Amino acid sequence: MSLLTEVETYVLSIVPSGPLKAEIAQRLEDVFAGKNTDLEALMEWLKTRPILSPLTKGILGFVFTLTVPSERGLQRRRFVQNALNGNGDSNNMDRAVKLYRKLKREITFHGAKEVALSYSTGALATCMGLIYNRMGTVTTEVAFGLVCATCEQIADSQHRSHRQMVITTNPLIRHENRMVLASTTAKAMEQMAGSSEQAAEAMEVASQARQMVQAMRTIGTHPSSSAGLKDDLLENLQAYQKRMGVQMQRFK
């Protein structure tokens, strides 16, 4: 796996699924391929994206700044600085300075990532802030190692939280989660269907599923009534793809 592929993988792992994630993935690909060279426009686009947490925006802004060539005098962006200041916690700053000194001695991506993984997310973000604000310099490889370590920690905590929700025994939470997943799957089906004639059927199935979820929420239904809803939708989607000549074995 190339360095940039690895960075893209880690960064995207902390972005919530949805159309915005696909957009961000495209931007990252363009930046890494050298196709997008307007850092100012890129940062303005990032700043106005909804849904993303300030820290995720800060990390993406840091990655864009590392990758896109820019004039030396280009202003640093406040939304990135605020996200990478470790909540103004002096402990985070102390640890970030110690980490920075260690990173100065590293020359490889993996070496930097290993060193960084033993620090808290707050210290890692603050260390990124030091580099972003030009208070310290490390090689791009080392900076990317720091980015990936931070993303790994965030993704770990997101995974723990997600797993807790998946294994919860509360039937109301499970019911709502199944309806949310069915609704987002239906939305994805509508986007993929496009405008071909064969798409009408897929669009109809997706539309019915969304109406069903809406009705279930409106009248209130038994928590077990949503079981299998998303899987039924995915089966329909795969059948539609087969007819279109697209073979995607796993969508779950």
UniProtKB/Swiss-Prot annotation:
GO terms for molecular function: RNA binding; structural constituent of virion. It is a peripheral membrane protein. Residues 1-164 are annotated as: Membrane-binding. Belongs to the influenza viruses Matrix protein M1 family. Plays critical roles in virus replication, from virus entry and uncoating to assembly and budding of the virus particle. M1 binding to ribonucleocapsids (RNPs) in nucleus seems to inhibit viral transcription. Interaction of viral NEP with M1-RNP is thought to promote nuclear export of the complex, which is targeted to the virion assembly site at the apical plasma membrane in polarized epithelial cells. Interactions with NA and HA may bring M1, a non-raft-associated protein, into lipid rafts. Forms a continuous shell on the inner side of the lipid bilayer in virion, where it binds the RNP. Determines the virion's shape: spherical or filamentous. Clinical isolates of influenza are characterized by the presence of significant proportion of filamentous virions, whereas after multiple passage on eggs or cell culture, virions have only spherical morphology. Filamentous virions are thought to be important to infect neighboring cells, and spherical virions more suited to spread through aerosol between hosts organisms. Residues 165-252 are annotated as: RNP-binding. GO terms for cellular component: host cell nucleus; membrane; virion membrane. Coiled coil: none annotated. This is Matrix protein 1. GO terms for biological process: viral budding from plasma membrane. The keyword Transcription regulation does not apply. It holds the Pfam family Flu_M1. It is found in: Virion membrane; Host nucleus. The gene is M. A motif (Nuclear localization signal) lies at residues 101-105. Homodimer and homomultimer. Interacts with NEP. Binds ribonucleocapsid by both interacting with genomic RNA and NP protein. May interact with HA and NA. Cannot bind NP without genomic RNA. Most abundant protein in virion. When expressed alone can form virus-like particles in transfected cells. Its main location: virion.
